[in-house]
């Protein structure tokens, strides 16, 4: 297996350590469980439905998004470099009777034999955890079919994002383990759109996600100041 070298061992170890609680809706990944319906709806609606489509989930982790896409009829392949998260993902899929092809590999290496193969590629909450985000973006672009969709989500790099996602979510609210995020690795929307454009991915839409700690609810917002998603289309 060729992996290429766009991997941060410390990031892999961080999520390996938490893998056992991946599917606990009240555990360390509670925010992902609560956020996932918004992600799934955005992907499905923007792409015109993913039923019957070939979908690649880059940085799938324990499979929360992968499983939800498979349940609505997508043919899903999940990529990750963490052994423990992949083991958890495979076991949970087996227990729930969902068919997903989980593979240990990087996007760059998987691209070598899968150019233009997927109708939809998702890369959610992953770019801020790799040394070279532009390399992942280019690989995603290379693997999607012309006219296909590539979805990215990450965190904006500004003071508000630092306060909400690190000081708030990690230190005050204890929603995430301390050290989950590094503010220096956050990506501004303008930067992400430029990187996508360089990979011949046209940004069709962008939406923000906001969290209310009182109601414990995530919702869409027009503001891209903190968490956000973009939908891009591969040029024909």
Swiss-Prot record:
Function, as annotated: O-methyltransferase that catalyzes the 2 O-methylation steps in the ubiquinone biosynthetic pathway.
UniProt GO BP: methylation
UniProt-listed SUPFAM superfamilies: S-adenosyl-L-methionine-dependent methyltransferases (SSF53335)
Pathway where this protein functions: Cofactor biosynthesis; ubiquinone biosynthesis
Entry-linked CDD domains: AdoMet_MTases
Annotated S-adenosyl-L-methionine binding sites: 39, 59, 80, 124
UniProt-listed Enzyme Commission number(s): 2.1.1.222, 2.1.1.64
Catalysis: reaction(s): a 3-demethylubiquinol + S-adenosyl-L-methionine = a ubiquinol + S-adenosyl-L-homocysteine + H(+); a 3-(all-trans-polyprenyl)benzene-1,2-diol + S-adenosyl-L-methionine = a 2-methoxy-6-(all-trans-polyprenyl)phenol + S-adenosyl-L-homocysteine + H(+)
Organism annotation: Shewanella pealeana (strain ATCC 700345 / ANG-SQ1)
Family: Belongs to the methyltransferase superfamily. UbiG/COQ3 family.
Official protein name in the record: Ubiquinone biosynthesis O-methyltransferase
């Amino acid at each position: 297996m060729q992996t290429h070298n766009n991997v941060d061992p410390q990031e892999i170890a961080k999520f390996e350590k938490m893998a056992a609680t991946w599917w606990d809706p009240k555990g360390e990944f509670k925010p992902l469980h609560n956020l996932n319906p918004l992600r799934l709806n955005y992907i499905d609606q923007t792409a015109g439905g993913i039923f019957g489509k070939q979908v690649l989930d880059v940085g799938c982790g324990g499979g929360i998004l992968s499983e939800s896409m498979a349940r609505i009829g997508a043919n899903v392949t999940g990529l990750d470099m963490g052994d423990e998260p992949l083991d958890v993902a495979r076991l949970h899929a087996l227990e729930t009777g969902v068919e997903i092809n989980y593979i240990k590999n990087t996007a760059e290496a998987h691209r070598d034999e899968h150019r233009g193969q997927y109708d939809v590629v998702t890369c959610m909450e992953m770019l801020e955890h790799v040394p070279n985000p532009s390399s992942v973006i280019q690989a995603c672009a290379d693997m999607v079919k012309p006219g296909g969709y590539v979805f990215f989500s990450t965190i904006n790099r500004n003071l508000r994002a630092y306060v909400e996602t690190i000081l708030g979510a990690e230190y005050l609210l204890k929603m995430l383990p301390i050290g989950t995020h590094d503010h220096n690795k956050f990506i501004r929307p303008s930067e992400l759109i430029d990187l996508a454009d360089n990979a011949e991915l046209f940004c069709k839409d962008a939406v923000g996600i906001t969290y209310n700690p009182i109601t414990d609810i995530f919702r869409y917002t027009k503001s891209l100041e903190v968490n956000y998603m973009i939908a891009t289309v591969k040029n024909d």
